[in-house]
Amino acid sequence: MAFKLWERFSQADNVFQALRPLTFISLLGLAPFRLNLNPRKEVQTSKFSFFAGIVHFLFFVLCFGISVKEGDSIIGYFFQTNITRFSDGTLRLTGILAMSTIFGFAMFKRQRLVSIIQNNIVVDEIFVRLGMKLDYRRILLSSFLISLGMLLFNVIYLCVSYSLLVSATISPSFVTFTTFALPHINISLMVFKFLCTTDLARSRFSMLNEILQDILDAHIEQLSALELSPMHSVVNHRRYSHRLRNLISTPMKRYSVTSVIRLNPEYAIKQVSNIHNLLCDICQTIEEYFTYPLLGIIAISFLFILFDDFYILEAILNPKRLDVFEADEFFAFFLMQLIWYIVIIVLIVEGSSRTILHSSYTAAIVHKILNITDDPELRDRLFRLSLQLSHRKVLFTAAGLFRLDRTLIFTITGAATCYLIILIQFRFTHHMDDTSSNSTNNLHSIHLGD
């Protein structure tokens, strides 16, 4: 019975079924669209999800307002200093701005998310004309594993965080802990949505590269170009040894799914140009839809990483601020929070970097084909595609301020280290001023006593 249920759930023959995990978050209002499995296969906005998003955001604002009015915060339960009060206020401000941006773009820019899915459907139809079909089941399982992993990650994180607070004899109110938990949940859902959409683009870039690689393999076989470097196989280098053995013995078998591509490469290159153009439009729409929410998420993640590091160093440098019984819980709580935000940034960076990496393979394969073929019509198509590749490059940014690639990790590390040193210097300067003030008051008291 369980096996049949799993087989039924894991079945995916189109992009709609592959996006089932993404539609689950529509109940929270962060994906206000619905998929119609009718013959027309339409993607429509959902009024229910739009209403759920408004209710969700108003509930967060209510909890946030009550916690601010009562002056409760998680860090305030441990210790209070001028810097912690400043950091707490900064995190509150960035938190409400980030949540407003996330819900605002999710609800009022939802048509862009719908256009992303619709353009993916058009791309899949072009692939079918070329005799290719995406592995929708793999996409479904990939998104399902990502959603399950993020769900378990957040459940464990929030449960352990609450347990650490309770074990430290801290009992946060429902409003305070809800204000703490909801941003984590919403950030995770937005990042999950970003990973799903970038994976849709990445998988299609990968399929596009396979088409070009098949054209390249066909030319290598026809010309018996054994002198070419094994690196000519861009999609999968291991295929070269198998291709070499076939060239020595018998030609490689041409499968029916690639017959259109090999028999009419000019038509295939023309369709590849159309697919690449649509994929660039998809990636541009992804950037426009996620640019400000991701900017808010990265900004608040950077601040949490910075201040969590400072809290831990503050407790190490001045252990008297913490009771002996709550010191272990303090370190564990803020270390877990630090790791959580680092994981979020890594997921964003990897989701965009993998898509950019697969899109960059296309230009390499195109120029490898140009170096081999002498067909004037095919070369003309390839030159046009090469020009398109040079002008339409995939790039993800956060409102154009910085790129969402692996260089962002190095940038955040350097900036956090710099500001952490400044905070430590400010802390020591403030501590020295307090010490000198106390010494002056003591000397003045002694002088008056005399």
From Swiss-Prot:
Tissue specificity of this protein: In addition to expression in a large number of taste neurons, Gr28a is also expressed in a few nonchemosensory neurons, including the campaniform sensilla of the wing, leg stretch receptors, and multiple dendritic (MD) neurons in the abdomen. In larvea, is expressed in neurons of the terminal external chemosensory organ, the dorsal external chemosensory organ, as well as in the ventral and posterior pharyngeal sense organ.
GO CC annotations, alphabetized: axon; dendrite; membrane; neuronal cell body; plasma membrane
Cytoplasmic side: 1-47, 109-138, 193-292, 351-407
Positions of transmembrane segments: 48-68, 88-108, 139-159, 172-192, 293-313, 330-350, 408-424
Membrane topology category: Multi-pass membrane protein
Function: Probable gustatory receptor which mediates acceptance or avoidance behavior, depending on its substrates. Atypical expression also suggests nongustatory roles in the nervous system and tissues involved in proprioception, hygroreception, and other sensory modalities. It is also possible that it has chemosensory roles in the detection of internal ligands.
Chief place of localization: membrane
Similarity comment: Belongs to the insect chemoreceptor superfamily. Gustatory receptor (GR) family. Gr2a subfamily.
Keyword hit for Cell division: no
Keyword Secreted recorded: no
Compartments reported by the entry: Cell membrane
Biological processes annotated in GO: chemosensory behavior; male courtship behavior; monoatomic ion transmembrane transport; sensory perception of taste; signal transduction
InterPro entries per UniProt: 7TM_chemorcpt (IPR013604)
Protein name, entry field: Putative gustatory receptor 28a
PANTHER family for the chain: GUSTATORY RECEPTOR 8A-RELATED (PTHR21143:SF104), INVERTEBRATE GUSTATORY RECEPTOR (PTHR21143)
Residues annotated as glycosylated: 82, 438
Extracellular-facing ranges: 69-87, 160-171, 314-329, 425-450
Native source species: Drosophila melanogaster (Fruit fly)
Signal peptide: none
Listed GO MF terms: ligand-gated monoatomic ion channel activity; taste receptor activity
Keywords: Cell membrane, Glycoprotein, Membrane, Receptor, Transducer, Transmembrane, Transmembrane helix
